[in-house]
Amino acid sequence: LAAQLGLIQRSTRVSIDQPAILVFAADHGVVAEGISAFPQDVTWQMVENFLGNGAAINVFARQNGCALHVVDAGVNHDFGPRPQLLHRKVANGTRNFALEPAMTAQECATALDHGMVLARDLPATVVGFGEMGIGNTTSADALMHKLTGQPGGRWVGARGGSALLPRPARPVPKGRRLT
């Protein structure tokens, strides 16, 4: 890790000043396919938990001297102003990619731009990234399928609560026909 930081910082004297963690939160429309044992409302409830310093990431950040910033990138909930919350909502979640494209090209570009600007503008030399959103594992699997052409399901392990599901949901194959 030290060698990687040195290469990134182009220095043999690695500096870890004001480390920060950005947790991006958003809802995923593919949840409508029954892929999660948990309701979509858990996304905004977890954001509230982060903001109330009640989650594991809060403990990790505190114990490691990291500033924690929660980013509303597309939660289907309206949050009031909070010191730790950065409002960068692109939409109230994505659409169901098993039925239609999850995002428009413009929505995707805007979301990526928000992330780049946030990472660039933080007064930190080291930034950690996290994510929260019911359905995020299935969405990540679909992205990896599109990026690599490899079969869906090979990139992710068991989803949170998947043992509670009555049947395995398979939205990634359905979504393959979409461009």
Q: Which residues are covered by each model-predicted region?
A:
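N-terminal loops that bind phosphate or other acidic moieties
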Residues: 1-179
